[in-house]
Amino acid sequence: MNLTSIPALQDNYIWTLNDDSGRCLIVDPGEAAPVLRAITENQWQPQAILLTHHHHDHVGGVAELLSHYPDLTVYGPQETSHKGANSLVGDGDRIHVLGLDFTIIATPGHTLGHISYFSHPYLFCGDTLFSAGCGRLFEGTAKQMFESFQKLNQLPDDTLVCCAHEYTLSNLTFSHTFYPQDTEIARYYHEIKELRSKNGITLPTKLELERKINVFLRTKDVELQRLISTEPDHLDEWEIFATLREKKDSF
């Protein structure tokens, strides 16, 4: 199976998976043109589209892709029913695409109906878990996003986190403010800074790495809790997470 990221819009990535026969699936096509180019250049045969949530930069290309490939199955949560999804899925559902079995994981927070798709090792998590970061809370609550992170954090170390935006460098800058002496964060920051200076793509990332560099996955850390609050013992872990998200909003 071959994993490809297609840059789109300002900082989006549209993910594709294709097998050796050229059959492919498409994840969160925010626009159609770059996907159609990739299909033509690689002689792919699209089989399905996976949608994580209803925002335009994730669904904007669906209608045009369906005009070219009207038989495509478009999987998505209920909130995408008016955005082109023709096969609605929810938490715990399983779908079979390209010979892979994907489990649907409800990951509300960014939107109320946001979902992620997991078929080891691939995790398509939209705007929930970013490399070194966390999606903004447009509809859901910090507690919902925290609980979504806990679900994703149960996946194996070698999970490939295929998120939808190139935010890694700015997220690492935020992480570094809490852990200025952390050698792993510092090392990775310089690696990513060099990569981005050449317009390189920082994704996918592995969950094993994210557990080391992503402050939103380190809310159990007593050192971090003390930086967040003078009375961390009086806060639930999700409240530490919520405070981090508030600080990131104004960072």
From Swiss-Prot:
One Gene Ontology biological process: methylglyoxal catabolic process to D-lactate via S-lactoyl-glutathione
Residues that hold Zn(2+) 1 according to the record: 53, 55, 110, 127
GO molecular function: hydroxyacylglutathione hydrolase activity; metal ion binding
Keyword terms, alphabetized: Hydrolase, Metal-binding, Zinc
Catalytic activity: an S-(2-hydroxyacyl)glutathione + H2O = a 2-hydroxy carboxylate + glutathione + H(+)
Disulfide bonds: none
Enzyme nomenclature, EC number: 3.1.2.6
Cofactor note: Binds 2 Zn(2+) ions per subunit.
Keyword Phosphoprotein: no
InterPro entries assigned: Clx_II_MBL, Glyoxalase_II_hydrolase, HAGH_C, Hydroxyacylglutathione_Hdrlase, Metallo-B-lactamas, RibonucZ/Hydroxyglut_hydro
Cofactor(s) this protein requires: Zn(2+)
Pathway: Secondary metabolite metabolism; methylglyoxal degradation; (R)-lactate from methylglyoxal: step 2/2
CDD domains: hydroxyacylglutathione_hydrolase_MBL-fold
Class in the EC hierarchy, top level: hydrolase
Positions that bind Zn(2+) 2: 57-58, 127, 165
One matching Pfam family: Lactamase_B
Record flagged with keyword Membrane: no
PANTHER family named among the record's database cross-references: HYDROXYACYLGLUTATHIONE HYDROLASE, HYDROXYACYLGLUTATHIONE HYDROLASE GLOB
Family (UniProt): Belongs to the metallo-beta-lactamase superfamily. Glyoxalase II family.
Protein task: Thiolesterase that catalyzes the hydrolysis of S-D-lactoyl-glutathione to form glutathione and D-lactic acid.
Quaternary structure note: Monomer.
The protein, known as: Hydroxyacylglutathione hydrolase
Gene from which this protein is expressed: gloB
